[in-house]
A protein has these predicted regions:
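Glycine-rich/acidic phosphate-handling loop/turn and adjacent ATP-lid/helix
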Residues: 68-102
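Bergerat-fold GHKL ATPase/HATPase_c domain
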Residues: 1-43
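Solvent-exposed beta-strand sheet faces enriched in polar/charged residues
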Residues: 62-64, 79, 119, 131
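Conserved ATP-binding N-box helix of the HATPase_c
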Residues: 35-61
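Glycine-rich phosphate-binding loop
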Residues: 98-114
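Flexible, glycine-/charge-rich segments associated with ATP-binding catalytic modules
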Residues: 1-14, 110-134
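ATP-lid-like helix-loop hinge signature
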Residues: 52-72, 77
Length: 134
């Protein structure tokens, strides 16, 4: 796997969620992602970036345009130093929410991408890495 370009984008306030969506849309377009796949990726970004702000107290989105077997993709890691997720199994259940949301953020995001990895612990923050291939 090779990495073409990468960077970090702050996700500290609600406005950063919009900017993260715009950045990822551009990255996906530049690597030739089909509109349907681009839309799925941007929707997942919206959910995860919003969770980073609302539940994680803000954090960062690390991004990379990558290639594997001549297939480009976008890999994103959302990380925060918030309270973490005490029960991952429960959090990954459709309809469950720790706040006022619909409870579709994590499970919805997972369904919209090709790869989804969640690393969290109470008091240690949360790190979610997603990848969408073209």
């Amino acid at each position: 796997m090779t990495q073409a370009s990468s960077g970090t984008h702050p996700v500290l306030i609600e406005q950063d969620v919009v900017l993260a969506r715009q950045l990822v849309r551009k990255l996906a377009q530049d690597c030739g992602m089909r509109l349907i796949d681009l839309t799925k990726l941007v929707t997942a970004v919206s959910e995860l970036a919003r969770n980073t702000v609302v539940y994680g107290g803000g954090g960062y989105m690390d991004w990379a345009v990558i290639e594997k077997d001549h297939r480009p993709g976008v890999r994103l890691t959302f990380r925060d130093e918030g309270p973490g997720i005490p029960d991952i199994k429960l959090a990954m259940t459709d309809g469950w929410t720790s706040g006022s949301g619909l409870g579709l953020g994590l499970t919805g995001a997972k369904r919209l991408v090709n790869e989804f990895e969640l690393d969290t612990a109470p008091g240690k923050g949360t790190r979610i890495t997603i990848t969408r291939w073209t």
